[in-house]
Amino acid sequence: MSAAHNPLRPPMTRPTGRFLLAHPAHAIALGFGSGLSPKAAGTVGTLWAWAAFLALQPWMSEARWGLLLLISLPLGWWACSVTARHLQAADPRCIVWDEVIAFWLVLWLLMPTGWPEQLLAFGLFRYFDAAKPGPVRWADRLYHDMDPSHTRHGWAKAGWGILVDDLVAAFCTLLLMALWRTF
């Protein structure tokens, strides 16, 4: 049994570059390193998502973005589930793939738009993700009141729990952006 799976060993407090490279799921879940930030990993992961979106934009059509998001959701669920299990934590702060998928969704549905709207969307998304008002708090609590450590099925549920609140934060961001655009 490896140290990452040993229930007698305390959970890792903060992953390292070695942990990131130890499994493909870790690299994905940790946002290809952006989740290793010692402070504000969610914000750093969202900034990485924004930069990656802009870098990929010249080669992506609407259909390609849709396909990438459809692939990224189950891939992200798997990566988040595996990484959370290896870290022995239901929703480690270093896992930022949830921010990546959710902010890509926001940008995909907002584009084309200029820097001011992208910046506003970034700020709103970070607010909803960090403060977890109303519906985001509800989504966060759906899965986080459980102890996933006993079963593999529990870790699979933890993976969805990591993703769901960020998707609700993306929806709230898009709703406010739509209201802002109408006025």
Give, region by region, the residue ranges found by the protein language model:
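Hydrophobic alpha-helical transmembrane segments
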Residues: 2-89, 93-95, 100-183
